[in-house]
Amino acid sequence: MPIQVLPPQLANQIAAGEVVERPASVVKELVENSLDAGATRIDIDIERGGAKLIRIRDNGCGIKKDELALALARHATSKIASLDDLEAIISLGFRGEALASISSVSRLTLTSRTAEQQEAWQAYAEGRDMDVTVKPAAHPVGTTLEVLDLFYNTPARRKFLRTEKTEFSHIDEIIRRIALARFDVTINLSHNGKIVRQYRAVPEGGQKERRLGAICGTAFLEQALAIEWQHGDLTLRGWVADPNHTTPALAEIQYCYVNGRMMRDRLINHAIRQACEDKLGADQQPAFVLYLEIDPHQVDVNVHPAKHEVRFHQSRLVHDFIYQGVLSVLQQQLETPLPLDDEPQPAPRAIPENRVAAGRNHFAEPAAREPVAPRYSPAPASGSRPAAPWPNAQPGYQKQQGEVYRQLLQTPAPMQKPKAPEPQEPALAANSQSFGRVLTIVHSDCALLERDGNISLLSLPVAERWLRQAQLTPGEAPVCAQPLLIPLRLKVSGEEKSALEKAQSALAELGIDFQSDAQHVTIRAVPLPLRQQNLQILIPELIGYLAKQSVFEPGNIAQWIARNLMSEHAQWIARNLMSEHAQWSMAQAITLLADVERLCPQLVKTPPGGLLQSVDLHPAIKALKDE
């Protein structure tokens, strides 16, 4: 068979295989066209699940008579005109394929009138060459599209349609999703002459929860937590259900929108799931209705035939942004604060020469996927632009710190004078500065050690606490601060703000940099050991601890942080949220002990209480000999 150009109808039918999957696909494409036309009211009439009739009527701007024929042609659209438009799409439709594809597998009639025209015009395509016929008609300003006998000329496609009830349920779900995306549009849905759904438009500044409850149900509305989160050009708004009260019925409510376009994106779902995983069971799913707004240049919507998926240019930033936004709201539900442990305990004093002799501290290095940011000098940050209002969103959820992070990254590193070479310290003796060799792990968090024929047990959590304290305690120079990807903004009382201002110099030595305003404090940087911690819990507790202190010493603060990280609640968070050290392995124990021996050699000479316990084998040996 020679190569030849396909007839227009056949080419459109091939394209319809991607665009028109079922009647719900037709409804989606046509309703999105109505929204792009500026409609504020859309009436949808369905018969026999969409197989017999789909009628969409709107009060949008309409289509001019001269453009009706083009509207039914392939690759004809008013949404884009250049490659620049394609790279920054703000409309729902843009390919110009929907009407041509639908008309090739159905009997489609397009009737429209603009405000400038005295009469309406009707167009329909027929025949092998899809010739368009235009004739006068009676119609108000707006557009009506009628799709009759879907797949009438493609029997193979028609036989794959499900039952009338199933097909209409898919249409109903599409309308639910669209109604959640556009609260300002009235949408009416009828099936076989009976009104099924009526979603009234919500006036600007009105109660969006009314429509939310009508679509998602009162059970979701009762558990919904409002979100408003912002970072630079990224904005996250909407609701997420309290994971502690999620039911299988609520788990079906998972609606996400990117710039007003409904999406099923795995990256977004993963970020939300990760933020809720400590409160959800293995077989549970979070329930949410979220709206992500992003610069159109930073997202590609032209990656899926049905436009169900998008691709973000900075996917990691978007993932972490959504994760932090959802997590911050869930943390508001923690009603019982942790008791502050003010029990004094002698802190090990860091020895600079041992730090030099130890070389690199692998325990304190970040994960390979995160580059280490350069040291910087804290500088005042300019205010960021306010977020758009969102009904019933709590003020504490507003995060407007994008400019803070940008300024941190743009701050040049200070010039450092070359240091004179320091004399090398003599190598440490093999046994004098060692706990011994690790034999095995006992009870998941204790290491069984052997040294010079003696057996002892070492508590790995206690050893980790001492190591964290040594890492946080400043030596000759302050601890290196690492800027946060998304600064943490918290509401504080007057007493807490005063304590933070008094402790600012001590916190700076520990690598904790913050900026305060009237009622909030913004954490901009933390030391490296805290980068992987849950700062939404740790920082409020630290502020509460500082509010009870009168003297602010870096060593005491470092000691408190180390003790807090290994508290009972922090261990629960580590097991459930980060799955960190729920079961210690031999490799983890050996690495930990090596770092403790390098940074805290005094612990080897004089172990503190709770760290090391000798095991007396003589009674067991004697019992064996007696038998």
From Swiss-Prot:
Keyword DNA damage: yes
tRNA processing recorded as keyword: no
Annotated region (Disordered), positions in chain: 363-397
PROSITE patterns: DNA_MISMATCH_REPAIR_1
Biological process per Gene Ontology, one example term: mismatch repair
GO CC term (a single one): mismatch repair complex
Keywords from the named record: DNA damage, DNA repair
Molecular function terms from GO: ATP binding; ATP hydrolysis activity; ATP-dependent DNA damage sensor activity; mismatched DNA binding
InterPro entries to which the protein is assigned, alphabetical: DNA_mismatch_repair_CS, DNA_mismatch_repair_MutL, DNA_mismatch_S5_2-like, HATPase_C_sf, MutL/Mlh/PMS, MutL/Mlh/Pms-like, MutL_C, MutL_C_dimsub
SMART domains named in the record: DNA_mis_repair (SM01340), MutL_C (SM00853)
Composition bias, Low complexity: 364-387
Similarity section: Belongs to the DNA mismatch repair MutL/HexB family.
Function of the molecule: This protein is involved in the repair of mismatches in DNA. It is required for dam-dependent methyl-directed DNA mismatch repair. May act as a 'molecular matchmaker', a protein that promotes the formation of a stable complex between two or more DNA-binding proteins in an ATP-dependent manner without itself being part of a final effector complex.
Protein name: DNA mismatch repair protein MutL
Species this chain originates from: Shigella flexneri serotype 5b (strain 8401)
